[in-house]
Amino acid sequence: MDDYMVLRMIGEGSFGRALLVQHESSNQMFAMKEIRLPKSFSNTQNSRKEAVLLAKMKHPNIVAFKESFEAEGHLYIVMEYCDGGDLMQKIKQQKGKLFPEDMILNWFTQMCLGVNHIHKKRVLHRDIKSKNIFLTQNGKVKLGDFGSARLLSNPMAFACTYVGTPYYVPPEIWENLPYNNKSDIWSLGCILYELCTLKHPFQANSWKNLILKVCQGCISPLPSHYSYELQFLVKQMFKRNPSHRPSATTLLSRGIVARLVQKCLPPEIIMEYGEEVLEEIKNSKHNTPRKKTNPSRIRIALGNEASTVQEEEQDRKGSHTDLESINENLVESALRRVNREEKGNKSVHLRKASSPNLHRRQWEKNVPNTALTALENASILTSSLTAEDDRGGSVIKYSKNTTRKQWLKETPDTLLNILKNADLSLAFQTYTIYRPGSEGFLKGPLSEETEASDSVDGGHDSVILDPERLEPGLDEEDTDFEEEDDNPDWVSELKKRAGWQGLCDR
């Protein structure tokens, strides 16, 4: 600490304090995070992970790491100071005046670039929110606060420990399911929605209704003056099934964001980190399959046309009457050729349908009665890969023996029971909680002037676990590999920490 002079405190949280400091020799300003070190060795190691991860993240859209050291029972992380404040402050300063779309998309593109970088490094941020997005006076946007981040063992893994701020948490975490990089995309969508509306996407008067609204994924539409592409982008990021959400790479290589990477960002920023993304954009273009044409037919047609043109050139010196007769003959021959081709196509099609030596098989377009008959009285069961009975024409039964970890897919009911009588201060430092006797609203920093409704479309019954939630989609980042963890069940951990072991049994 001797090399730094503390100027003032710029933030405070459960971790400790954030200080604005000045380096004694260079007079340069830095932000310093002061973290109280726990007494246990394992917890101390976890606290040190933030410094280790941040030191690896060298990117213009990520808060730069300078150094870290320990003194007097505290860990100090010195990092770049962003003189424009955080995004939450910027949103609140608007006081109801909406941001222009080009500004929103410029900020969002830079956020995507930062998130894409950490995902390429196999890191999940796990607490992306407006307070953790920082601005500089020259227009740069930077992702910060890696205190909740997690390094996965491989790029195709899932994490399973609950971390995050409730307003930005995706449905799969509330449902106690493993999650991957797509949880960060949901949180990024929450920030984009806040930039467009100056409000949280999900607002409620209680934990119960907040969780139910998030699990349903229903949001109010954006203001109508924003473009259709922007509104579609928000909807894509709020897909309940994680595999249906775009990855950061996909966001940067398609649509309006892709155009911004090349056109709207300053040239010096593109020179710094844009080459990789621009290359991905080029590779992603023109991937849609096109209708195939018969090249031999094209060559025949071109040959016929060429010979016709040559004949016309040779006879060009003939009389006007000869030219007219030539044209009439050409028209008649063309009509006859078209008629012959149509008849020929019909006969060829009939021959193909009846020919036994086809390259492509013609599948019968009827209901598969055999399969329906076999499955008519079968019970619907989850199964593994080992068959005990493989008799033809019967339903195969599978054993439950498996070497694969079976995740406990709890419904949000368990969580709701735990939080039934919970103190709303568990919503972390991000939120302003009304004290008892003041209507008990669960409020976020952007819901001070709003009274959220407790109505939830569809009630409890509409919150149904999607059995294909973790099935791989088209995005190559989606996998079905799980991350090993000593404590995969965050709901049980929540019970333990809150001292509510017997609450659910009441």
UniProtKB/Swiss-Prot annotation:
Principal location class: cytoplasm
Region (Interaction with VAV2) location: 1-285
Catalytic reactions of this protein: L-seryl-[protein] + ATP = O-phospho-L-seryl-[protein] + ADP + H(+); L-threonyl-[protein] + ATP = O-phospho-L-threonyl-[protein] + ADP + H(+)
Biased segments, Basic and acidic residues type: 314-323
Residue intervals of the Protein kinase domain: 4-257
Description of how the protein assembles with itself and partners: Interacts with PXN, PRLR, VAV1 and VAV2 and this interaction is prolactin-dependent.
Name of this protein: Serine/threonine-protein kinase Nek3
Encoding gene per record: NEK3
